[in-house]
């Protein structure tokens, strides 16, 4: 078990501990449960979907990286597949505050990068901030996304975001979690191809500037991130954050980064390379490889 989970795990009910123990024993537990695993954990613990998501929040919050605020937020996203995806807020000391990943963004992007096609619900241990409410409005679930908070009846995103402005107001048809392929040809080695594939999946309808990023760890694992643009612009999530999020949730440290490749167009309206390099430098990594989409 990864050390970050030990304290939270010890506080779980005994039946839930017994059900989860073999699943999270690996140091590189991927911070998600498949639909089959969820069904088995529910059977052993006696918890329904919502109760299980609430019970898992301490484990999700344990994934947070909060060097600045020291305030851990956890989120658990339930995909249409029945899979559960953990998320935690992530802060990067030495980088701009805008590079922060919120817990809801973490869980949602985690599900997206795993190939999920939509969300049925998201459970959070604190009320979503306005930034996250706007971010969630870019999903294909729209204002109907179910939001579960401790001590409150389930609500929909529309209850938290009245008079919403979003992609539908701009006649955007393809949303986050919908199938997207920008059609750029794969080339180069495995890391380069992974970055291009991530760019092909990116959601960039406002700037028309798709981008993707791939991280290779020292043990040869590759984690990718796709750019997630937002109708309100500022809540957009860069591809580096999506990849760092996936890597961290899988139990890796920033020191495990071996190579990073960023794929974007030379003539892109929105340029990721400078902010990407600056954030990587804050994490102690300085060799960003650039890949031109063509």
Swiss-Prot record:
The EC designation for this entry is: 3.5.4.5
Keywords assigned: Hydrolase, Metal-binding, Zinc
* Record InterPro entries: APOBEC/CMP_deaminase_Zn-bd, CMP_dCMP_dom, Cyd/dCyd_deaminase_Zn-bd, Cyt/Deoxycyt_deaminase, Cyt_deam_dimer, Cytidine_deaminase-like, Cytidine_deaminase_bacteria
Task: Enumerate the active-site residues.
Answer: 104
Is Nucleotidyltransferase given among the entry's keywords?
no
Q: What class of enzyme is it?
A: hydrolase
Question: Tell me, which GO biological process terms does this entry list?
Answer: cytidine deamination
Cofactor needs = Zn(2+)
Molecular function (GO) terms for this protein are: cytidine deaminase activity; identical protein binding; zinc ion binding
Co-factor binding comment = Binds 1 zinc ion.
Reactions performed catalytically? cytidine + H2O + H(+) = uridine + NH4(+); 2'-deoxycytidine + H2O + H(+) = 2'-deoxyuridine + NH4(+)
Residues binding substrate: 89-91
Q: Where is the CMP/dCMP-type deaminase domain?
A: 48-168, 186-294
Per UniProt, subunit arrangement is: Homodimer.
- To which protein family does this belong? Belongs to the cytidine and deoxycytidylate deaminase family.
List the PANTHER family.
CYTIDINE DEAMINASE
* Function statement: This enzyme scavenges exogenous and endogenous cytidine and 2'-deoxycytidine for UMP synthesis.
Q: What is this protein identified as?
A: Cytidine deaminase
Task: Give the originating organism.
Answer: Cronobacter sakazakii (strain ATCC BAA-894) (Enterobacter sakazakii)
Lineage per the UniProt record: Bacteria, Pseudomonadati, Pseudomonadota, Gammaproteobacteria, Enterobacterales
Gene from which the chain derives: cdd
